[in-house]
């Protein structure tokens, strides 16, 4: 319920700012994390469901590590750090345009 109120306030202020076209354009930045971020994306993006956003990658089988010849390697150890919606909207503040770009 709190999230709905926050989103309504966010959209109201965003709409007021967009309505003043002759003045300098500004965008409100918000910081949203965790389940609130997932719920917001699910609400903003019509083709994304909350359960899909909250799913994590499936566990990898330890038996696979030996097949590539690196039994000491951990899953994901070779992957670099990827920036994503959590970096854009939780670590840093993001605008409505940034949120919509993840739809």
UniProtKB/Swiss-Prot annotation:
Signal peptide annotation: 1-19
Gene3D superfamilies reported in the protein's UniProt record: Insulin-like (1.10.100.10)
Highest taxon in the source lineage: Eukaryota
SUPFAM superfamilies, per the entry: Insulin-like (SSF56994)
Claim: Transmembrane helix is one of the keywords in the record: no
Organs and tissues of expression: Located in 4 pairs of medial neurosecretory cells in the brain.
Keywords annotated in UniProt: Cleavage on pair of basic residues, Disulfide bond, Hormone, Secreted, Signal
Covalent S-S links between cysteines: 33-90, 45-103, 89-94
Localization annotation: Secreted
Pfam families tied to this protein: Insulin
One Gene Ontology MF term: prothoracicotrophic hormone activity
Main location: secreted
One GO cellular component, as annotated: extracellular space
Keyword rRNA-binding: no
Chain positions listed as propeptide in the UniProt record: 57-80
Protein family per UniProt: Belongs to the insulin family.
The protein's assembly and partners: Heterodimer of a B chain and an A chain linked by two disulfide bonds.
Protein's UniProt name: Bombyxin-related peptide A
Originating organism: Agrius convolvuli (Convolvulus hawk-moth)
């Amino acid at each position: 319920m709190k999230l709905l109120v926050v989103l309504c306030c966010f959209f109201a202020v965003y709409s007021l700012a967009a309505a003043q076209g002759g003045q300098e354009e500004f965008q409100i930045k918000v910081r949203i994390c965790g389940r609130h971020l997932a719920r917001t994306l699910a609400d903003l993006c019509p083709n994304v469901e909350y359960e899909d956003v909250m799913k994590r990658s499936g566990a990898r089988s330890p038996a696979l590590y030996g097949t590539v010849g690196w039994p000491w390697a951990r899953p994901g150890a070779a992957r670099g750090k990827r920036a994503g919606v959590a970096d854009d909207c939780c670590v840093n503040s993001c605008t409505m345009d940034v949120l919509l770009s993840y739809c």
